[in-house]
């Protein structure tokens, strides 16, 4: 018998916990030729900004031994085109849409939340706070508790009451729990983690940086242990806050690891580039991983690694992840 994979995105029930990660599949059109996008928990869109944005010069991507660096620069058509074209398409396919938003000022984030609140079909908002604050010398919102709280509060204040707001946290901080606390206190309904880590690669042949933008976001298997650590720390501090976990997930077993650390949902990103059907494959593998261990409900193993005595009892019974 298959496991019950239902989970909750704030107050909204999802049929399963597998989502796309923002930035790895546009708004889902690219994946529709490979699988039915309504079959996974939700499509998390590429971050949307108020105005169209060209992004950074090329080269924008560089492979690493265990992942990749990207320096896309939030290229996109802007909120008007998204609302006219992308969101209606997601609705027509029966997909649940978690819309990622990004901005350079607190007011830009708030305006985006207001625009989305007037639209039909927005399941939730993911707030990409890993953007430079143009009003504070380029300080990244996600790296300062006060700035992270200001953005979260502004978005929650402008978003429609029934749209959950998830703040997406950066691992490029010394204390991710303090950032999480600021966002939750400011009204976040949940948290997404982790965003990419800032990295750099130099081409030994050209003797120059591999990316035109010099630095980029590191993703892929290399960052999964960091994601597990961050999820663990935040779940330990906030037992009841919904968490979307992400970072280097390639298999159902990888997803299980994040779930045991405390993730209620798991976003799949970089692996989509070489396996466009990865989301449905990982969903199937997750079900298999749980079922073969006798786990009947996903909810029973969320954060289970925090309960060593309960886990020990399960192990003695021959039924443990």
Question: Where is each model-derived feature located?
Answer:
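Predominant activation on well-ordered alpha-helical scaffold segments within soluble catalytic domains
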Residues: 32, 80-87, 149, 153-156, ...
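Active-site metal-binding loops of divalent metal-dependent hydrolases
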Residues: 23-24, 247-249
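Short gly/pro/ser/thr-enriched loop/turn and capping motifs at secondary-structure boundaries
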Residues: 49-54, 132-134, 198-201, 272-275
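Alpha/beta enzyme core
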Residues: 104-244, 252-263, 268, 319
């Amino acid at each position: 018998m298959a496991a019950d994979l239902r989970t909750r995105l704030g107050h909204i029930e999802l049929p399963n916990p597998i989502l796309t990660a923002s930035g790895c599949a546009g708004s889902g059109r690219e994946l529709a030729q490979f699988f039915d996008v309504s079959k996974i928990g939700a499509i998390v869109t590429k971050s949307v900004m108020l105005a169209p944005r060209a992004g950074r010069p090329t080269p924008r991507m560089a492979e690493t031994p265990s992942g990749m660096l990207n320096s896309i620069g939030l290229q996109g058509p802007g909120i008007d085109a998204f609302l006219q074209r992308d969101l209606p398409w997601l609705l027509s396919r029966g997909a649940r849409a978690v819309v990622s938003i990004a901005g350079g000022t607190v007011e830009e984030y708030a305006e985006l939340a207001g625009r989305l609140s007037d639209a039909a079909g927005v399941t939730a908002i993911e707030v990409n706070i890993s953007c430079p604050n143009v009003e504070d010398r380029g300080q990244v919102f996600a790296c300062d508790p006060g700035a992270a709280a200001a953005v979260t509060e502004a978005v929650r204040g402008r978003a429609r009451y029934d749209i959950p707001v998830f703040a997406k946290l950066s691992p490029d901080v010394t204390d991710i729990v303090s950032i999480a606390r600021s966002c939750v206190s400011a009204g976040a309904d949940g948290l997404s983690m982790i965003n990419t880590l800032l990295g750099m690669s130099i081409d030994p042949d050209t003797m120059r940086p591999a990316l035109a933008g010099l630095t980029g976001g590191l993703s892929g298997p290399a960052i999964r242990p960091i994601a597990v650590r961050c999820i663990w720390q935040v779940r330990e501090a906030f037992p009841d806050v919904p968490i979307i976990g992400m970072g280097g997930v390639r298999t159902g077993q990888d997803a299980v690891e994040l779930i045991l650390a405390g993730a209620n949902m798991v976003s799949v990103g970089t692996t989509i580039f070489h396996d466009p059907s990865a989301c449905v494959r990982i969903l199937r593998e997750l079900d298999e991983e749980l079922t073969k261990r006798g786990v009947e409900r996903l909810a029973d193993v969320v954060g289970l690694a925090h309960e060593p005595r309960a886990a020990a009892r399960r192990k003695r019974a021959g039924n443990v992840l």
